[in-house]
Amino acid sequence: MSKLPIVIAPDERLTTRASEVIDITDKIKELVNDMFETMYYAEGLGLAAVQVGVLKRIFIMDVQPEKAEDGPAGYESTGKFCMINPEITELSGEQVILKEGCLSIPEQSHEIKRPKYLTVKYKNLNNEEQTLKASGWLARCIQHELDHLNGILYVRHLSKLKYDMAMKKAQKVKRHYEQ
């Protein structure tokens, strides 16, 4: 396993829709292991393949019990997952505003409104179809990472003015990281 470099915004890879994974090969499994190592090193909750420069529909996340929230019966709010070719099949009408951050937009966090509950279909590393009902931070993390796979940065959910300010700050931070 090895730590991968994280793509920092602005970068066109972060605004490009990722392509579906056709075969779950040993190379894909190695990528996922490296992504977990990278995410833990960076102290993130989730990481999409596009954030390490791989334009494939894969993301990982590990939402620990301290982030748990009470949700409806049958909904998970914590857990460690690898989701391949994920697709949200249901979103709750109930929305909640919480502060989010992103490993690709360091040194920033913003309040984002998202649905509180969801259902997602995906494949795991064993190429098995899975369905998950998620709530709380787990649901939020799924939406955030799936946005990455669709070429959408979380700051796109802000007003134009706040988005422009966030990207201006991101440009300054990126220059600092590149030195």
From Swiss-Prot:
GO molecular function terms noted in the UniProt entry: metal ion binding; peptide deformylase activity
Gene Ontology terms: biological process: translation
Cofactor(s) this protein requires: Fe(2+)
Residues binding Fe cation, per UniProt: 102, 144, 148
EC identifiers of the protein: 3.5.1.88
Keywords: Hydrolase, Iron, Metal-binding, Protein biosynthesis
Bound cofactor: record note: Binds 1 Fe(2+) ion.
Catalytic activity field: N-terminal N-formyl-L-methionyl-[peptide] + H2O = N-terminal L-methionyl-[peptide] + formate
Alphabetical list of InterPro entries matching this protein: Peptide_deformylase, Peptide_deformylase_sf
Transcription recorded as keyword: no
Active-site annotation: 145
Enzyme's top EC category: hydrolase
Xref: NCBIfam families: pept_deformyl (TIGR00079), PRK00150.1-3 (NF001159)
HAMAP family: Pep_deformylase
Role played: Removes the formyl group from the N-terminal Met of newly synthesized proteins. Requires at least a dipeptide for an efficient rate of reaction. N-terminal L-methionine is a prerequisite for activity but the enzyme has broad specificity at other positions.
Protein family membership: Belongs to the polypeptide deformylase family.
The protein's name in its UniProt record: Peptide deformylase
